[in-house]
Amino acid sequence: MELQLETFPLAPLITDVVKTIEPLAAKNANQVAVKCDGAIRTLHADQMRLRQALLNLLSNANKFTERGSIAIAARQEQENGRDHVTIAVADTGIGMTPEQMGKLFQEFSQADASTTRKYGGTGLGLAISKRFCQMMGGDITVASEPGRGSTFTIRLPMMANAPKAGAEESHRR
């Protein structure tokens, strides 16, 4: 799987993804809020894969939240002289225990069997989203507490580079 790196404005991508999820959010009586740091002009990454990761995170936030709120916030940060973008998707949903979070990014895995029965899904979305972010030199992390919701954070370099030869193999192990 090869990255299709391009330079694109981040704010319209986030707006488009939120518009896609808003009808589902309305069905669950969820409010969706967006905050995008004006300092972020463009991002050099795989736009299609970032879109898919954001759709997965927002879909999950909506799936596990009823009559609550979902917020997506993007900001630019600098670490060790490199610019990064951080995109956080936070919800006021059911939340997870540390044990559940430990299984979250494994393929075909959900928090637990009762989650699969109640909410459906294959358990592939987060594993794939994490892989996409890692291919672009970033990652996805999660913070959560049962009954209080979850926050998933994507962190990507502002200028993603194509993975070095062999990096794809290491993701398959």
Walk through the language-model features, giving the residues of each.
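Short beta-strand/loop element within the Bergerat-fold HATPase_c
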Residues: 69-81
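Short helix-loop "hinge" at the ATP-lid/N-box region of the Bergerat-fold HATPase_c
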Residues: 61-62
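A conserved beta-strand-to-alpha-helix junction within the catalytic ATP-binding
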Residues: 4-19, 51, 86
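ATPase catalytic-site recognition across NTP-hydrolyzing enzymes
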Residues: 99-106
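Glycine-rich ATP-binding loops of the HATPase_c
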Residues: 137-143
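Glycine-rich G1-box
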Residues: 23, 94-95
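Conserved catalytic submotifs in the C-terminal HATPase_c
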Residues: 4-9, 26, 31-41, 77
